[in-house]
Amino acid sequence: MEHTWRWFGPNDETTLTDIRQTGATGVVTALHEIPNGEVWPVEAIKARKAMIEAHTLRWSVVESVPVHEDIKKRTGNYQEYIQNYKQTLLNLAECGIDTVCYNFMPVLDWTRTDLDYELPDGSRALRFDQTAFAAFELYILERKGAESEYSDEEKAQAKIFLENLKAEDKDRLVANIIAGLPGSEESYTIEQFREKLDEYAGIDKDKLREHLKLFLEEIVPAAEQGGLRLAIHPDDPPRPILGLPRVVSVKDDIEWLLGAVPSPVNGITLCTGSYGVRADNDLVDMVQRFGSNIFFTHLRSTKREEVAGSFHEASHLGGDVDMVGVVRALLVEEKKRNDNNAPSLIPMRPDHGHQILNDLEKNSKPGYSKLGRMKGLAEVRGLELGLKSTL
């Protein structure tokens, strides 16, 4: 695997010099300063690429070129935004970038309720508390139709949870959910959030799938022209939330995606932490089944909790993800590619990381503390080296 590191640009507290010292050889980044829907200019791409290469690193993956909400809904200026997206892909290809990660999640990217969940060893992790989320959706957001989606017991527990929240904790919960997490390019107030959700009225899973297919039918030819691979990121968490449909959550969704627009450049980002939240997602089988279409991987693990739907982010080699099996399957896939004289290395980044040691004293981006990710990268690298000796 190609060891990479997510970098949020020149203002990231983790510098390119730091990244070199982690052992990573590739960088995963984007031009976050460019508003959603606008074309990424060649000059800006070249400047960022030169900055990375000046530190003897490679810009391995763009994560991500955000898909404008109008494209997902097929409303407003969606056709203009699709044309801009295609031009951005061509500009990236012109600059020698070969892989783009993107997602098709409506309104929110990844969602958590707690950004400072304390683990038994004193480190901190990200957490999705289903009861807290229900309290937000039912009694703070007061989403229309939400009542029918929860049992009486779930509603009672959510009410108790909310009643025990201090005012500042309530504000924090709201901010955690709707204020935008790292990599997300949008944030909202409660009223704006309600309006955004209402815009998806009438768009169910089948309709969102249709919109994704139409989008891919337009951008895949541009990607093929530029020799650039498209790697869709799964939903996080991988199930419908807030009345919004989700279209990249399980194996059947991947099969649909690859069959809807067959192309050697239409592929996936294997995010083990996202897919792994669901017990019915067999990650090793997914690698074996879709290996040739895995263009990028995020390796992290989650631990499902007693309350259905709740989970927290575990250590990279802990939790519910069979990381040994997943890495072994990825190495087997790389060997197949190498045997067929195809580009073999799959870019991998240690996704998220616990806040540990002196990172606990820093105001790091949630999930993106330096030391926690470096620990995860070292663990996965050691696992990879050990497994290679057995293949």
Curated annotation (Swiss-Prot):
Its EC number(s): 4.2.1.8
A GO term for molecular function: manganese ion binding
Pathway: Carbohydrate metabolism; pentose and glucuronate interconversion
Catalyzed reactions per annotation: D-mannonate = 2-dehydro-3-deoxy-D-gluconate + H2O
GO-annotated biological processes: D-glucuronate catabolic process
Cleaved signal peptide residues: none
UniProt keyword annotations, A-Z: Iron, Lyase, Manganese
Cofactor(s) the protein needs: Fe(2+); Mn(2+)
InterPro entries, A to Z: Man_deHydtase, Xyl_isomerase-like_sf
Superkingdom of the organism of origin: Bacteria
HAMAP family the record matches: UxuA
Summary of the function given for this chain in its UniProt record: Catalyzes the dehydration of D-mannonate.
Family under the similarity heading: Belongs to the mannonate dehydratase family.
Record protein name field: Mannonate dehydratase
Organism: Marinomonas sp. (strain MWYL1)
